[in-house]
Amino acid sequence: EKLQIALSLEKIGVDIMEVGFPISSPGDFKSVQTISKNIKNSRICSLARCLEKDIDAAGEAMSVCDNFRIHIFLATSTLHIESKLRKNFNEIIEMAIFSVKKALRYTNDVEFSCEDASRTNIDNLCRIVEKLIKSGVKTINIPDTVGYSTPDELTFIIKNLFERVPNIHKSIISVHCHDDLGMAVGNSIAAIQAGARQIEGTINGIGERAGNTALEEVIMAIKVRKNILGVSTNINHKEIYRTSQMISRICNMPIPSNKAIVGSNAFSHSSGIHQDGVLKNRENYEIMDPRSIGLKKVKLNLTSRSGRAAVKYYMSEMGYKDSDYNIDELYTDFLKLADKKGQVFDYDLESLAFINKQQDELEYFRLQFFSVQSISNNLSTASVKLLCGNKTYTESSTTSNGPVDAIYQALNRITHFPIILQKFQLIAKGKGKDALG
């Protein structure tokens, strides 16, 4: 499954994929090794702490491919240094430089993450970044590890690095944002505007706690707001939806319907005003073409707020002409069903149109109510209320072998007509518990 995800990420066109933490387990080591053998068009990266055994494991796992990256991380905030690592800042710098030199024995592509950078003293951050770049780090990652930062704060940090670190031009600035306060994507976009040129994220925003930056959201923000951001990616946008759905299934993590870009409602319209506007010109209420992420077309949700235009659109999509049905009658019945079900589907409309056409003639017999209870010994008891002309007859407690026969015995007792069941078939005209029968 990890290989399947990696192949999909390669197909979508990610530049670098971090595929595991080899020291964590033999299974993770093997999966990193397997992915490294199979991925050809994206650079493979694996994670390591500032420990020799971690770096050795990462280098050995990826040695089966030609070009790879080792991503080292170490906390730099005072809180983490004092309470977690129990060291001083000078010792942190020494550990970081030693680990970078160790990683450079395996590859010339080393990334360093200053863990909890968003809560690190800016003077200390500038100091360690300068020394890391001098030691050979090509990518400096600024993580908002606990999702604490705001866009303005992250912008301040990155601008300070560009202004105060003299060798900053020798490295790419990256950000790794978490979504604890719901600002991961906003922070990532702000970082791009401040000069960051690598964004770390995950498809669907999957990740620790509240998740990471949703990659698909950043990608489409860059595409849609290119006039503001002025950058581009190598991503194949039309693979976004397929990749999102596949990862959702593999990870058993359903995508919320209101999720930006890939949620089932992202390109759906329920309001009649919006639906009419979209049918006239989709740009009235859509800033993205759904086809740009791999979807086929716009989706109109049929609800009690939908207008006649949406109903006529769906009937047309199913091949019906305006002359095939009465829009006023159909729309009236549609609203009744929508009030009951909440959302109506195209097959419901078809059923309503069919039922309307079949019930034009006055009915002498009309079934008002029936109830069936199955009891032991395969016996069933049926209660039936039947309208005959203007008079209502009621028959109850008719027992027979099976529920269908019990109903027909009850009907026969009321009408005294011989009822012969020639064919019995139960078909749901639609889906779900509210389907029309």
Swiss-Prot record:
Stated role: Catalyzes the condensation of the acetyl group of acetyl-CoA with 3-methyl-2-oxobutanoate (2-ketoisovalerate) to form 3-carboxy-3-hydroxy-4-methylpentanoate (2-isopropylmalate).
Gene name for this UniProt entry: leuA
UniProt catalytic activity: 3-methyl-2-oxobutanoate + acetyl-CoA + H2O = (2S)-2-isopropylmalate + CoA + H(+)
Protein's GO biological process: L-leucine biosynthetic process
Source organism, top-level taxon: Bacteria
Protein name as catalogued: 2-isopropylmalate synthase
Pfam family, one: HCS_D2
Annotated family: Belongs to the alpha-IPM synthase/homocitrate synthase family. LeuA type 1 subfamily.
Subunit and partners: Homodimer.
Keywords: Amino-acid biosynthesis, Branched-chain amino acid biosynthesis, Cytoplasm, Leucine biosynthesis, Manganese, Metal-binding, Plasmid, Transferase
